[in-house]
């Protein structure tokens, strides 16, 4: 069996993000009070792409925030003695705003739970929605994405990697086969 398998190429990624952008606009009836927040790291890249798509469609550049959830994780003590902390930058008031959280992959649901908790510590949004490029299943919490690029059934012996130019000099999604469960 192959160790890596491509499940989405650059064009498929682009089309999925364009579709998600249209779905966000449709569900929210436009851009009023709408803001995007990308979850560090690859969620930020995908949020920027959605922001660009919406700007091309509506002619409006949505506010975009960057969220690091490191200290909100329920597995922080298991990660490392010195976890890598990225920046959080949300330069707009989130109170009474419709926030679309963006991430690359949803697996157990724990990352988005932490992101929601972090947002709630910053204010009281009118609504929080969740957009994700890949939903791989295996939820451990009662959380689902509002916008999904692709549902990809996986086993616990697989890892989904979303590759983006900004970090990987590539745009595609691959599944890596492991020898053990995660």
Curated annotation (Swiss-Prot):
The entry describes its oligomerization and partners as: Homodimer and homohexamer; in equilibrium.
Q: Which domain of life is it from?
A: Bacteria
GO MF terms held by the record:
RNA binding; uracil phosphoribosyltransferase activity
Give the EC number(s) listed in the UniProt record.
Answer: 2.4.2.9
**GO BP: any one term:** DNA-templated transcription termination
Instruction: Give the signal peptide as a residue range, or say none if absent.
Output: none
The record, for Pfam families, names: Pribosyltran
Name the residue ranges of motif: PRPP-binding.
99-111
Q: Which InterPro entries match?
A: PRibTrfase_dom, PRTase-like, PyrR, PyrR_bifunctional
Q: Which reactions is this enzyme annotated as catalysing?
A: UMP + diphosphate = 5-phospho-alpha-D-ribose 1-diphosphate + uracil
Q: What name has this protein been given in UniProt?
A: Bifunctional protein PyrR
State what this protein does. Answer: Regulates transcriptional attenuation of the pyrimidine nucleotide (pyr) operon by binding in a uridine-dependent manner to specific sites on pyr mRNA. This disrupts an antiterminator hairpin in the RNA and favors formation of a downstream transcription terminator, leading to a reduced expression of downstream genes. Also displays a weak uracil phosphoribosyltransferase activity which is not physiologically significant.
Task: List the keywords (alphabetical).
Answer: Glycosyltransferase, RNA-binding, Transcription, Transcription regulation, Transcription termination, Transferase
Give the family, as the similarity comment puts it: Belongs to the purine/pyrimidine phosphoribosyltransferase family. PyrR subfamily.
